[in-house]
Regions:
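Acidic, glycine-rich flexible loop/linker segments
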Residues: 321, 335-337, 357-360, 365-388, ...
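Long, charged amphipathic helices and adjacent flexible linkers at domain junctions
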Residues: 68, 79-82, 103, 175-176, ...
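Conserved metal-phosphate-binding beta-hairpin within the catalytic cores
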Residues: 137, 309-334
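Conserved catalytic alpha/beta cores of large enzymes that bind or transform nucleotide phosphates
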Residues: 213-313, 318, 357-365, 391, ...
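N-terminal beta-alpha lobe that positions the nucleotide/phosphoryl donor
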Residues: 1-186, 195, 284-292, 300, ...
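Extended active-site and interfacial segments that coordinate phosphate-rich ligands
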Residues: 136-169, 193-269, 328-360, 404-411, ...
């Protein structure tokens, strides 16, 4: 028996040749990590020896070799027929008596109470789930198998799945000899996730490869809906360093629609063992996991990653009967762990065209090609290499087809769907979950698939002009004396940008989060009942329906956005500027018009620090402070600093500091908290010593400082030609600000485009002794080059 089946408690990674990657990993976790609290369902596995004995007893080795020799290895025109014949040979065969008896004995020992308890029966090939052989899903698994008769049938079906079309093609593509691959079958106690939830996890951020995140996603019911991409799952981002410190480590939660719930078919005679049902409305607006459960899974993920010594791809499930969480599979992550994250290619579309469809962007590339609408993988011969697959949804059966595609577009699916996983592995762009791509895209027309514009992917009509920039940051040295920092606004770009050479974030714009993630005016949330427009109220209700108070929605979303950026650059400084909309910009937020005055010149009106203590906005400023307090104190991201914009007078600075104290941001109670002020008004420069008595540092805002020094309205096209940061008056103010700040013992930096565009301006700043310069990401490399040259010249001139 021992040679034909092995209990999980007796299996380790070293047994991979006998039980395959999947079962070796399950056994390793069960035997080695259970003592650390990682819960893995018990089970056993048939061995490779059992598989060979099955083939030999039925004299199948030679017939299978002969079948594979008949395969058309150029065009694969007879792949379907060959695969079907091979599977029939195995399904028509019988299990040797000693193997069948061993399986039945192992099954009964798992429970001991009944012969009808449910198990999962999973295939595990001896070359599956290895980093160099990464396509999972080549072989079949069978869930909710009850009784010895059904179990033995499922084992034969697993054996037959070694010859699915996709498995045969995969072995051909990877140079594996068909007659050298054995199949082990894992038999594992079922987790009743059909009564609860299930999902997947990565011990890195799956889009960028950022290593300090545990990314979890989950759906109601069985996890197949995530793999198939038929529903939009909940997503959770957990930050490893603060998790280890027992802080509130969930930095971001995204509520998915979870439209369907997959459960076991109530009809025992149904052709399908599972059925998809519509999720109840109340379940769709509820997260599948509580915060404690999210952190428990994340801690297990850390234990698993530490044990294996590499990033891991994990499957989890919650038992609806016991309420317990389980890890049901773990394999090495195979995409980002194989890449150098410091080699980055960025794309920019110079002129956008007509948008045909949008969805979730997978990757950051752009591809142009002929659209080929394919209802199923059986029409693979229609696709020519370099064309773009447009379909409803993909599954592992699509793998041979997708390898020829320049890009993938699907109407269904999410970031963890099959199409997304394959796109990452193949390194091609994909736009998933479009909803209307098949309707709007014509078969045979040329399209451009763009994933370079953030989380949203676009499909444009025609061939667009694309600019490609290749960076290798592996050996790029930062300046020696002047910090090179980034300007960041979009949390969705933060993890990718963390691989750029940087000394932190010199300006985090809060406005992007409010506009794109929150969308509503904070006062409209606080005084929702005052709103008279029914359409606006309905839109706000749709955004906030799963929060008990609408103000909590603002605080939570803002805190998550800030925390994501702070985590991406942790422990480097992330200087968060409090909201700096102008009144016309605030008015454009949902409900904003009811709370904003109409101003002739908003650029010089009710903006910046003046709002924070004013009765029109002070309640909203409290929400901003609560978000900062949550990020620093509860989440433990103490690298977050605060910056006050457009502070006109020293007295106004005192009022803002007092307002922050009243709202819980008190430097006496939190000595690590630093508060900076923008130096963008001449009064900030002329009275820099007095401002330095209130604030911990300055950041020169060259745009507003130029506007106010030269009396130029930045929004006026007529006088825009006079706008010049290098005007002597502006440079004198900048030089004065740097000298006065340093004299007062305060740090000072500058945010803006000019140091990257004009080497002589960078030279001026370095000569003045500025502490840091912050750049937009696309200007960072040029900016670093200019700073380094300026530092070299400054040293030579001394």
């Amino acid at each position: 028996m021992k040679n034909l089946i092995r209990k999980f408690s007796d299996i380790h990674l070293t047994d991979l040749p006998q039980v395959g990657g999947k079962n070796a990993s399950l056994g390793e976790m069960f035997s080695e990590l259970s003592a650390q609290g990682v819960r893995v369902p018990d089970g056993f596995a048939t061995t490779a020896l059992a598989f060979w004995e099955f083939l030999d007893t039925n004299r199948l080795r030679q017939p299978l070799i002969e079948l594979m020799n008949q395969l058309d290895k150029n065009q694969f025109t007879n792949l379907g027929a060959i695969g079907e014949k091979a599977r029939k040979l195995i399904l028509d065969a019988h299990l040797p008596d000693n193997l069948a008896h061993s399986i039945i004995k192992g099954y009964r020992e798992l429970d001991g109470m009944t012969d009808q308890f449910a198990v999962a029966v999973r295939s595990s090939a001896t070359a599956e789930d290895l980093p160099q052989a990464s396509f999972a899903g080549q072989h079949e698994s069978y869930l909710n198998i009850r009784g010895t008769e059904q179990l033995l049938i499922a084992v034969r079906k697993c054996y037959a799945s070694l010859y699915t079309d996709r498995a045969i093609k995969y072995r051909e593509d990877n140079g594996f000899a068909h007659d050298r691959i054995a199949l082990s079958v894992g038999v594992q106690k079922m987790v009743r996730s059909d009564l609860a939830c299930s999902g997947v996890g990565f011990t890195l951020e799956p889009e960028s490869g950022f290593r300090d995140i545990v990314h979890l996603s989950g759906v109601w019911g069985l996890g197949e809906n995530i793999v198939q991409g038929t529903v939009t799952p909940d997503e959770f981002f957990v930050f490893k360093p603060t998790l280890r410190k027992n802080k509130k480590a969930i930095i971001q939660k995204k509520l998915g629609e979870k439209e369907k719930t997959m459960v076991y078919s109530p009809d025992a005679h149904s052709k399908s063992a599972v059925v998809n049902t519509s999720s109840p409305p109340d379940k769709r607006v509820q997260f599948v996991l509580g915060d404690d459960e999210i952190e428990q899974l994340a801690r297990w993920a850390l234990i698993i990653e530490a044990h294996y010594g590499k990033p891991m791809d994990i499957e989890w499930a919650k038992d609806g009967e016991s309420g317990e969480l389980f890890i049901v599979q773990a394999r090495p992550e195979t995409v980002h762990s194989q890449r150098n994250p410091y080699r980055i290619t960025s794309y920019k579309i110079n002129k956008k065209g007509i948008t045909l469809a949008t969805g979730q962007a997978i990757g950051n590339k752009v591809a142009t090609g002929v659209a080929r609408l394919l209802p199923s993988p059986k029409e693979a011969d229609k696709l020519k290499p370099g064309e773009i697959v447009v379909t409803s949804i993909t599954s592992p059966d699509w793998d041979p087809v997708l390898k020829k595609a320049a890009a993938i577009v699907t109407d269904k699916g999410g970031r963890t769907s099959h199409a997304s996983i394959v796109a990452r592995e193949l390194g091609v762009p994909a736009v998933v979950g479009c909803g209307n791509a098949l309707q709007n895209i014509r078969d045979g027309e040329t399209i451009t698939v763009s994933c370079c514009e953030g989380k949203t992917g676009y499909i444009y009509r025609g061939k667009l002009e694309v600019q490609q920039l290749d960076y290798d940051f592996s050996d790029l040295q930062k300046p020696e004396h002047t910090k090179a920092m980034l300007i960041v606004g979009d949390p969705d770009q933060a993890f990718k940008l963390s691989f750029y050479p940087n000394d932190g974030v010199g300006l985090m714009r809060m406005e992007f989060i409010i506009t794109h993630f929150i969308q509503a005016h904070p006062m409209a949330l606080i005084k929702f009942d005052r709103l008279k427009d029914d359409k606006t109220k309905a839109q706000i209700e749709a955004l906030t329906h799963h929060y008990p108070k609408k103000e909590l929605y603002f605080v939570d979303k803002l805190a998550q956005g800030i925390a994501t950026i702070a985590a991406a650059f942790y422990p480097k400084d992330v200087i968060v500027r409090m909201s700096d909309f102008k009144t016309n910009e605030y008015a454009n937020l949902l409900g904003g018009k009811a709370f904003e005055p109409a101003e002739e010149n908003p650029m010089l009106g009710f903006r910046g620090a003046s709002r924070y203590y004013h009765e029109r906005y002070q309640q909203a400023f409290k929400l901003e402070c609560e978000a900062i307090k949550s990020v620093r104190n509860e989440m433990g991201l103490t690298n977050v600093k605060v910056m006050i914009p457009f502070c006109r007078t020293v007295e106004e600075g005192r009022k803002v500091i007092d307002a922050m104290k009243a709202n819980g941001l008190d430097r006496d109670l939190d000595p690590g908290l630093e508060i900076y002020v923008m130096a963008e008004i001449p009064s900030n420069v002329l009275l820099a010593e007095a401002f330095a008595g209130l604030f911990d540092g300055f950041s020169i805002g060259s745009n507003d400082l130029t506007q106010l020094a030269l009396g130029i309205d930045r929004d006026s096209a007529i006088v825009s030609s006079l706008f010049n940061e290098q005007n002597d008056a502006v440079k004198q103010l900048i030089g004065m600000a740097i000298r006065k700040a340093h004299h007062a013992g305060a740090k000072i930096g500058l945010c803006g485009q000019a140091p990257s565009d004009f080497p002589e301006f960078a030279q001026f700043l370095v000569q003045q002794g500025i502490d840091s310069i912050s750049f937009n990401p696309d200007a960072l490399v040029k900016g670093i080059e200019n700073i380094k040259k300026a530092e070299e010249r400054t040293i030579l001139s001394v």
